[in-house]
């Protein structure tokens, strides 16, 4: 029932899945129920075109606009049978009971009949890009050719839960042993010394040492950013779009003496940076401002290193944010390109000669990545790009691109820029 309501808000009212889950899950007392609702919502959004095709084929009359919650409930039932492999009797019973709780006893037999058909028959087969808006799928194909299918396929699969071990409290091997003592298994990454991939997802607060700051949750691709920036101890560092704070926290875990300014335009999101810093026991200067408005926040003292994790289309993290494909519009792209360009220009002004600026996005669109970088270099005479290296993915112009799922990480673009002296 909770999952059906969340899905109706996300699919039919354009709400954020992350926001709606954050509001809905605390209403459930049992952590197992919370995990099930979250798993159902992600499964439905990843498999929504399949379930829509099934309803189109199986229903004599299509569901109307007023049936959003009923459609969501049917998809909840499909997901339990199709992805989560809940025993059929349990999936049918729970979904039919939800009809009665929602005040639809007259629809219980209808829901039961549809789910029994799903149990008997195969669900329709749809193309791997069926969930992607046509304009976006066409752009992915134009950018990536034969690799487009791999992007679409990877975006349908659940993302692994990556952990970042805080090496100030102990080494990675010791933390793996703690996980094993708790009945959990994890695989170390060869790319980042702090990174571990859990064999299954779990509630963050149940991770050993999480609340004490001994471990954090952060995707592998995001964890690689700290080494690419690699500021010296005591350096002045700017994280220009800092929220929710994972990259700033990682930098400070590695070098607690950094003088790091965490900047974000959103006060609520910046509070999350503060909470993260408090949890891992590091200090940062927090500033609420638009990074492009230098007069509003910058004191004129240059930074040694700047991290610009720019707002983007999020096309590299669809496996973690499947509702991106519901909400992203073609007209969103140009404003994003404009703000990325303005952020690059503004942040560059704050960087000292000889300093390093790292530009990253969680996008796989060339317009936001190598094309954006090439345009910046063309208009910025004192900027030069250094190749991040093979550990950061395949060459993408003067940067590097990891596609979703490669080496277990999210889709990410990386560029390392040096300000000439």
UniProtKB/Swiss-Prot annotation:
Family (UniProt): Belongs to the class I-like SAM-binding methyltransferase superfamily. RsmB/NOP family.
Chief subcellular location: cytoplasm
InterPro entries on file: MeTrfase_RsmB-F_NOP2_cat, MeTrfase_RsmB-F_NOP2_dom, NusB-like_sf, NusB_RsmB_TIM44, RCMT, rRNA_ssu_MeTfrase_B, RsmB-like_ferredoxin, RsmB/NOL1/NOP2-like_CS
Superkingdom of origin organism: Bacteria
Residues making up the signal peptide according to the UniProt record: none
Biological process terms in GO annotation: regulation of DNA-templated transcription; rRNA base methylation
Amino-acid positions noted as binding S-adenosyl-L-methionine in the UniProt annotation, renumbered to this chain: 241-247, 264, 290, 309
Entry's localization field: Cytoplasm
EC number(s) per entry: 2.1.1.176
NCBIfam families linked to this entry: PRK10901.1, rsmB
Free-text function comment from the UniProt entry: Specifically methylates the cytosine at position 967 (m5C967) of 16S rRNA.
PROSITE patterns to which the protein is assigned, alphabetical: NOL1_NOP2_SUN (PS01153), SAM_MT_RSMB_NOP (PS51686)
Tagged with keyword Transferase: yes
Gene3D superfamilies, per the entry: NusB-like (1.10.940.10), Sun protein, domain 3 (3.30.70.1170), Vaccinia Virus protein VP39 (3.40.50.150)
Catalytic activity of the protein: cytidine(967) in 16S rRNA + S-adenosyl-L-methionine = 5-methylcytidine(967) in 16S rRNA + S-adenosyl-L-homocysteine + H(+)
Molecular-function annotations in GO: RNA binding; rRNA (cytosine-C5-)-methyltransferase activity
Active site (record annotation): 362 (nucleophile)
Protein name: Ribosomal RNA small subunit methyltransferase B
Keywords from the named record: Cytoplasm, Methyltransferase, Ribosome biogenesis, RNA-binding, rRNA processing, S-adenosyl-L-methionine, Transferase
Native source organism of the sequence: Xylella fastidiosa (strain 9a5c)
